[in-house]
Amino acid sequence: ALITTMAKMSFSNNTKRFREPNDVIFNVNNELYDSINGNGDYFTAFYGVIDMEKGMLDFSNAGHNTIFLAHADGSIDCLENNGPVVGVVKDLPFQVTSHSLRNGDRLVLYTDGVIEARDEQAALYGEERLMDIIAKNMSLNVKDFTEHVFTDLQAFCGNSPRCDDIALFAIDIIGIN
């Protein structure tokens, strides 16, 4: 909990100081390195900036899962930018990736607990199943969509134990000029 609080404060401070996602994550990494290096702790992070006038997403990814960008037609782009996790090595550069956005797109971010959830036979939920659920449910609003994913995940897992946090975040893109 302490590391999470420190990370939240660091992100809050650095997003005020820097616009570029790689600069934000670079500085968060350096600030937290001294606090968590050597004790085996680290964390993943995704930081993105959406420019609604240009219809662009600029992002950096520090060891987090692939981000899905779903389109209204059901196709999905996998937004990958696999930087190192935060807190392990100081002064590592992080990369910025840019991707165009369109009205009707949906960004889907999730924790590894979603794709690593297992059913009673120990099969993984996986990225493919999540992508299929995303593609087939683009017509749902964000609230109904996320509830549908969690309902499907619960049905898949049955009575198997949950071993990790499970979170999913979706953003519908509307109002691009």
Residues covered by each model-derived region:
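Conserved long alpha-helical elements within nucleotide-processing catalytic cores of c-di-GMP signaling
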Residues: A1-T5
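Conserved subregion of the PPM/PP2C metallophosphatase catalytic domain
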Residues: F11-N177
